[in-house]
Regions:
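Beta-strand-rich binding/interaction modules
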Residues: 77-118, 125-129
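Short glycine/proline/serine/threonine-rich loop/turn segments at secondary-structure transition edges
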Residues: 19-25, 39, 93, 133-148
Length: 227
């Protein structure tokens, strides 16, 4: 059904055509073959990242198909550019409606945009938005403010798909003269290189263990990590 030779990257598998009708039992089996030398250290074996079963309408948001960029930042507002890929797996064209709502770090609604969507049969359509955010709170190493882009795809009164994407509003730049700048301020990267394991917990990625790892790195003066 699906073969993936690299354990560090995410991948997806469409199992629609293999599923039994509603009411019947479906069994998902994963076989791991770990043969030969694959690393200079023990990299673990088996399923050591999260696995999700995703159910969508034939007309849906593309997995990993949302991009949020900060185009411009002033004292008064920030301008966001958001692109969303919509897939249509039907044999006929489809019409839908998309609404993007921006939620501030404080949980307040700070922006809403809406567009109609028309996707060809078995096609993909990229929908582009430009949204202003007044008095934006910028993301930085010391103040990691995170906004959310809530994307809702619907047809009539039926919700086809929805997703919430966390993101930070910030500007970055590089130059030979001034180096790396975050939000127009010079920032020296103090990086660490870590393997993906969590010591005695093994290679499995546990949410709290990953957060603790970052907390320890930051407490020791690091502001960049290579995993």
């Amino acid at each position: 059904m699906k073969f993936n030779a690299y354990g560090y990257s995410s991948f997806k598998c469409d199992i629609t055509s293999y599923c039994h009708p509603a009411g019947e039992v479906n069994t998902i089996a994963v076989k791991v073959t770990n043969e030969g030398k694959n690393s200079r250290w023990y990299a673990g074996s088996g399923i050591y990242r999260h696995v999700w079963l995703i159910k969508t309408d034939p007309v849906h948001l593309d997995e990993w198909g949302v991009a949020v960029r900060t185009v411009k930042v002033t004292d008064d507002e920030a301008i966001l550019a958001i692109e969303v890929d919509v897939l249509n797996e039907k044999t006929e064209s489809a019409e839908a409606n998309m609404v993007i709502t921006i939620i501030s770090p404080d949980g307040e609604e700070v922006g809403v945009e809406e567009q109609s969507v028309n996707v060809d049969a078995a096609g993909k359509q990229t929908i582009a938005f430009s949204l202003p955010v007044k008095q934006a709170k910028l993301w930085s190493v010391d103040t990691p403010h995170l906004y959310k882009a809530k994307i809702l795809l619907s047809s009539g009164h039926e919700v086809l798909d929805q997703i919430s994407i966390p993101f930070g509003i910030r500007t970055i730049s590089f130059s030979a003269k001034e180096g790396f700048k975050l939000n127009d301020l010079s920032l020296k990267l103090k990086g660490g290189c870590v393997h993906h394991d969590n010591g005695l917990l093994g290679a499995a990625s546990l949410d709290r263990a990953e957060m603790r790892k970052i907390e320890l790195l930051k407490a020791n003066g690091y502001n960049a990590v290579r995993c």
